[in-house]
UniProtKB/Swiss-Prot annotation:
Biological processes per GO annotation: D-xylose metabolic process; xylulose catabolic process
Residues in the signal sequence: none
The encoding gene: xylB
Domain of life where this protein originates: Bacteria
Protein name: Xylulose kinase
Root EC class: transferase
Site (Important for activity): D6
Keywords on record: ATP-binding, Carbohydrate metabolism, Kinase, Nucleotide-binding, Transferase, Xylose metabolism
Gene Ontology MF annotations: ATP binding; D-xylulokinase activity
Annotated organism of origin: Klebsiella pneumoniae
Active site: D233
Organism lineage: Bacteria, Pseudomonadati, Pseudomonadota, Gammaproteobacteria, Enterobacterales
SUPFAM superfamilies: Actin-like ATPase domain
Free-text function comment from the UniProt entry: Catalyzes the phosphorylation of D-xylulose to D-xylulose 5-phosphate.
Presence of the UniProt keyword Kinase in the record: yes
Sites where the protein binds substrate: M77, H78
Length: 483
């Protein structure tokens, strides 16, 4: 049996996987976020450990853990966990969604002119490196004591095994990794007055990084199981649904929208805010576009139009009057990441007349989210990635919307179920691979069951193509007014 642990922002999830790859038990412990100042977002690493300990004991109360062979860890990326020479935490961890260090991002790019080539990414406040520069500039007494910097999930690893280690996919989100070489960049570290000595050892996602310490194994009533590298949340989530090899891609419809495509080599397009990271699978990389408001636009629109729920919104969209004329919706309610990298981008309805009501607005929102998702997919494909299959995760029972997305993108989308387990499943699967031979990986990381293939309708593709062009022109014209 195998365990996967996912340290999320809102909770710690632990799952138990059997030899057939089936989830037999699961438990989640909630976490809270501290926001002591505007833009700040922090958590106490000790709370991570206490929640993990509680989740593991609850898992053991549901099913015996005495036959567990391996344990994998996934988690929220980019967080800065600062330790002193005694490996004690110096301050609350600064999280991925903390926005205090925009100025430090520019300073780092000025210091290292090749930073985008080295890291494959634009410097953004969410990443780890600018957080350390902020600490150096604003909390000098804390920075002077920093001996080690760990990512959130790797702090759990330290408590479990006593080892200082990370995996390639999570390390790629620090902006200290030379992503093409899969190694720390001395130049990027030096820009933060750090060196390799402050960094954990690097491993692939299915590499063994240590064993559970005897006292931890005893507390959890399990053997001293192997602990593997694991992965950052997006990479581990992709592994969980079988995205392990070049030519595979997934479109995830959550609060935000993420398009994740696997490659066999390092590719990048930082000028379009495409993320380029190492994958959690050996010898693989991935590109990722991020739309900040996807399903959250549907929640917002349901309230705006007075419809009872998102399903009601989607049902209303299907009754929209075709003769009323088109309405465009810019879905930038939280700014936008890919491809615009514009935190000032705003949501807009354009084209309203007396003929438009709630149903037409509902359809416009679904289409607008689709146009923005397709924009992100297009810039990823412009990096010379040609996915053989795109798995669609999320979207609930909204067959109408899923087909609309296929028609807007002009690409087949394979809707698969079972992806709701999340990154914990990928972490457990990586542990499963570690215990077996690497050659067995394809059989152990099979795709989830296919429920429906959404093939684009040529007539609807032709309808949406000019609508997408107008969508892009509306944003271009309004962009100067959004700052």
């Amino acid at each position: 049996m195998y365990i996967g642990i996912d340290l999320g922002t809102s909770g710690v999830k632990a799952i138990l996987l059997n030899e057939q790859g089936e989830v037999v038990a699961s438990h989640t412990e909630k976490l809270t976020v501290s926001r002591p100042h505007p833009l700040w977002s922090e958590q106490d690493p000790e709370q991570w450990w206490l929640a993990t300990d509680t989740a593991m004991k609850a898992l053991g109360a549901h099913d015996s853990l005495r036959h567990v062979k391996g344990l994998g860890i996934a988690g929220q990326m980019h967080g800065a966990t600062l330790l002193d020479k005694s490996l004690q935490v110096l301050r609350p961890a600064i999280l991925w969604n903390d926005g205090r260090c925009a100025e430090e991002c520019q300073l780092l790019e000025d210091k290292v002119s090749a930073s985008r080539q080295i890291t494959g990414n634009l410097m953004m406040p969410g990443f780890t490196a600018p957080k350390l520069l902020w600490v150096q500039r604003h909390e000098a007494a804390v920075f002077s004591q920093v001996d080690k910097v760990l990512l959130p999930k790797d702090y759990l690893r330290l408590r479990m095994t006593g080892e200082l280690a990370s995996d390639m996919s999570d390390a790629a989100g620090t902006m200290w990794l030379d992503v093409a070489r899969r190694d720390w960049s001395d130049e990027m570290l030096a820009a933060c007055d750090l060196s390799r000595d402050a960094m954990p050892a690097l491993f692939e996602g299915s590499d063994v990084t240590g064993q559970l310490r005897p006292e931890v194994a005893q507390a959890w009533n399990m053997p001293p199981a192997l602990v593997v590298g694991g992965g950052g949340d997006n990479a581990a989530g992709a592994v969980g649904i079988g995205m392990a090899d070049a030519g595979q891609a997934m479109l995830s419809l959550g609060t935000s929208g993420v398009y994740f495509a696997v490659s066999e080599g390092f590719l990048s397009k930082p000028e379009s805010a495409v993320h380029s990271f190492c994958h959690a699978c050996r010898g693989r990389w991935h590109l990722m576009s991020v739309m900040l408001s996807a399903a959250s636009c549907l929640d917002w629109a349901a309230k705006l139009t007075g419809l009872a729920s998102v399903p009601a919104l989607i049902a209303a969209a299907q009754t929209a009057d075709e003769s009323a004329g088109p309405v465009w919706f810019l879905p930038y309610l939280s700014g936008e990441r890919t491809p615009h990298n514009n935190p000032q981008a705003k949501g807009v309805f354009f084209g309203l007349t007396h003929q438009h009501g709630p149903a037409e607005l509902a359809r416009a929102v679904l289409e607008g989210v689709g146009y923005a998702l397709a924009d992100g997919m297009d810039v990823v494909h412009a990096c010379a990635i040609k996915p053989e299959a795109i798995t669609l995760i999320g979207g609930g029972r909204a067959r109408y919307w899923r087909q609309m997305l296929a028609d807007i993108s002009g690409l087949q989308l394979d809707y698969r179920t079972g992806g709701d387990v999340g990154p914990a499943l990928g972490a457990a699967r990586l542990a499963h691979v570690a215990v077996h031979d690497e050659a067995d990986r394809p059989g152990l990381l099979k795709p989830l069951p296919l429920e429906q293939a959404h093939r684009p309708d040529d007539r609807r593709v032709a309808h949406y193509a000019p609508q997408r062009e107008i969508f892009a022109r509306i944003f271009s014209k309004l962009k100067p007014l959004m700052s």
